[in-house]
Amino acid sequence: MAGKGEGPAIGIDLGTTYSCVGVWQHDRVEIIANDQGNRTTPSYVAFTDSERLIGDAAKNQVAMNPINTVFDAKRLIGRRFTDSSVQSDIKLWPFTLKSGPAEKPMIVVNYKGEDKEFSAEEISSMILIKMREIAEAYLGTTIKNAVVTVPAYFNDSQRQATKDAGVIAGLNVMRIINEPTAAAIAYGLDKKATSVGEKNVLIFDLGGGTFDVSLLTIEEGIFEVKATAGDTHLGGEDFDNRMVNHFVQEFKRKNKKDISGNPRALRRLRTACERAKRTLSSTAQTTIEIDSLFDGIDFYAPITRARFEELNIDLFRKCMEPVEKCLRDAKMDKNSIDDVVLVGGSTRIPKVQQLLVDFFNGKELCKSINPDEAVAYGAAVQAAILSGEGNEKVQDLLLLDVTPLSLGLETAGGVMTVLIQRNTTIPTKKEQVFSTYSDNQPGVLIQVYEGERARTKDNNLLGKFELSGIPPAPRGVPQITVCFDIDANGILNVSAEDKTTGQKNKITITNDKGRLSKDEIEKMVQEAEKYKSEDEEHKKKVDAKNALENYAYNMRNTIRDEKIGEKLAGDDKKKIEDSIEAAIEWLEANQLAECDEFEDKMKELESICNPIIAKMYQGGEAGGPAAGGMDEDVPPSAGGAGPKIEEVD
């Protein structure tokens, strides 16, 4: 075990549309199936008037409850409400989004009759809790430690927010790793037996909501990322959107009605489009069939693979740009790539594959790893390495990842002065000496940015802090050392020191951009606990209700059984029948009763039925072997297999 008495460490691929969890066990990675038997779980959370649903249960009811079912939290995490991508997504999401403090997007849902607000971190934490529970059910132990993956092109705020989601979920996030790098581990272990010497591998990871390309060299268990590129807002969902818009227009043309204002109709259409998209990866044509889509109108429409490709061709072509950029940054020629590895469900689209094959001059693509599971697989390996589990096969692996965006600070005139170039191997540390811009300047404002543009206003402000107390001096005399330090999670710390006075100040890039404070996270952790106990309460209630229902129906069947019914005295039989009918009526009228009410009802019913049934068996005339006596208080099993008759010595 992890040597910490906390069960093994797990690897979680927290995806935009689906998530997946793996663990290192018996010298290999086990990808764990959920309670529905699926190895990937929808990244959906639904709120109803009586409970909270996560995963398959949430996605399955989305058409009935579109406005309170939240998905795509990954497209919100670490972003501002005013972000252009958030604004374009709002038009497509059925749930309500509002701007919270510091422009943080907040999701508004109705839960148990009250309006509640959740941040993207909280929604993501609920999915992480679900993934942890899936692993705990399989392993039979509690789990504390996890490695969580993020798109390689996630920026600092998105990484930090994902880490916060882990904290809210009560997990110790040992490491945040990049998805393509995790997939490369899966590829490397898969190929280990056969490969000799250095290999240049391009990982092409096109998922439900994000897109990454990473170029690595792999040799003898050393995975070195040379360059990474991508788009944190491009994936399968965008292809679905194009198809949905196409059919909304089609419906308008055929029926002169606009369904775009009806969340339920749109959701049913989207589900059908997602299914059609998958079908078109293996066949050339399919039909969308939805009964009573809108105003009682049935919608049947064919779609061909060619039409689907035409609707998305600009997006598919857009997928090739990061591939070129990645090769340029790594200063490599496309002919020097040994393997092109497909990761993410959207790489099953034939057109995407064809464009890649054409780009690499007819080179065959590597499809030997499972595109849905490779990322969780790699995360599970990394979790095993970090917790000292696993055999020598994995303990010798070394991961050298890079930072995806250049980091620097603003100098006079709004110029971006870069300290750490993009694609620098992490962890890394860089120092540079700056000075004051005007005479007797008492302090300097250090503004930290990430991005590739020459002017800071075109880049992303990560945070700022003041270094004050500089003694009066002419401009250019004070010496201020600024140090940028990136840890293994790709998260940045910046410190500044005035050489003459020894004045210091530092910042872990946090609160400036809607980052959660320690207190907020603590509060969310407590809320997560509260929701968990509410979920458990609800489950208890459902179990108690089912137990009562089963008992009543089984008892009814028992006395209707001729063999038993005829052995009962008339008034006894009537007594049981009346009490059962009363119980069933009560059940129908009180579906939402409390757990203890169901339990009391159950006891009341048992106190009437059990003695009568027991008396009958004591007569020794029942079909079974006659027992010398009967335990009066035998409770029926909660599973409700009817009155449980035990032999007593």
UniProtKB/Swiss-Prot annotation:
Q: List the molecular function annotations (GO) for this entry.
A: ATP binding; ATP-dependent protein folding chaperone; mRNA binding; protease binding
Q: Does the keyword Cytoplasm apply?
A: yes
Q: Where in the cell is it found?
A: Cytoplasm; Nucleus matrix
Among the Pfam families in the record, one is HSP70
Q: Which Gene Ontology terms describe the biological processes this protein takes part in?
A: response to heat; response to virus
Instruction: Write out the GO cellular component annotations.
Output: apoplast; chloroplast; cytosol; cytosolic ribosome; Golgi apparatus; nuclear matrix; plant-type cell wall; plant-type vacuole
Q: What induces it?
A: By heat shock and by cold. Up-regulated by virus infection.
Keywords carried by this UniProt record = ATP-binding, Chaperone, Cytoplasm, Nucleotide-binding, Nucleus, Stress response
In residue numbers, the region (Disordered) covers 619-649
Per its database record, what is this protein's job? In cooperation with other chaperones, Hsp70s are key components that facilitate folding of de novo synthesized proteins, assist translocation of precursor proteins into organelles, and are responsible for degradation of damaged protein under stress conditions.
- State the family it belongs to: Belongs to the heat shock protein 70 (TC 1.A.33) family. DnaK subfamily.
Quaternary structure note: Interacts with GDP-mannose 3,5-epimerase and SGT1B (via SGS domain). Binds to the deubiquitinating enzyme AMSH3. Interacts with WPP1. Interacts with DEK3.
Q: What PANTHER family would the database entry show?
A: HEAT SHOCK PROTEIN 70KDA
> What protein name is recorded for this chain?
Heat shock 70 kDa protein 3
Its gene?
A: HSP70-3
